[in-house]
């Protein structure tokens, strides 16, 4: 009987451990891989939207269409110009904010938007603390590996005035790390 109890406890413990594992999304770009840890407890809608798009291949072949040195790199627009993209629900979704998750460091992953409750498919990665964005953009993850790739991308030449990279910065493939 004791062996059965130990076996059940061990099984339950392993199940809880498996469920506690972080979801990591990999953006395999033309200059290297960026690994992003998701924040599902902070922003469940944004994480569901992003990871579902990843699983469906939505981001494959899309460009980082806007790069502002010292601020952020932005992607996720199928039009490639900052005017397109939609959520998995085919309509914008609400913002998700947490008082303890703020733009206080570089390498945060957040939803790009055009105002309150306008989240779609576009996202950005910060390159510095950007406190003025608190309460305006949903943070739903962070870069955990490939920060050097993000910094390389930050330093590519861009067109003056519109911050479009002179050479395409492409997400060759986005996928969930196993």
Model-assigned labels for residue ranges:
Residues 13-178:
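Cyclophilin-like peptidyl-prolyl cis-trans isomerases
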Residues 5-14:
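Sec-dependent N-terminal signal peptides
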Residues 1-6, 109:
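Bacterial N-terminal signal peptides that target proteins for export
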């Amino acid at each position: 009987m004791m062996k059965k109890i130990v076996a059940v406890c061990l099984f339950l413990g392993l199940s809880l451990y498996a469920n506690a594992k972080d979801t990591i999304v990999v953006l395999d770009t033309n200059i290297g891989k960026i690994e992003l840890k998701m924040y599902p407890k902070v922003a469940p809608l944004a994480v569901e939207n992003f990871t579902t798009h990843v699983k469906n291949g939505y981001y494959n072949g899309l460009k980082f269409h806007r790069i502002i040195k010292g601020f952020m790199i932005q992607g996720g627009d199928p039009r490639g110009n900052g005017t397109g993209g939609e959520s998995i629900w085919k309509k914008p979704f609400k913002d998700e904010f947490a008082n303890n998750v703020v733009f206080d460091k570089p390498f945060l992953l957040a939803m790009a938007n055009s105002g309150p409750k306008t989240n779609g498919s576009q996202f950005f990665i910060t390159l510095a603390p950007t406190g003025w964005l608190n309460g305006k953009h949903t943070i739903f993850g962070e870069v955990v590996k490939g920060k050097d790739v993000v910094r390389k991308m930050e330093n590519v030449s861009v067109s003056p005035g519109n911050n479009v990279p002179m050479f395409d910065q492409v997400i060759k493939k986005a996928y969930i790390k196993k």
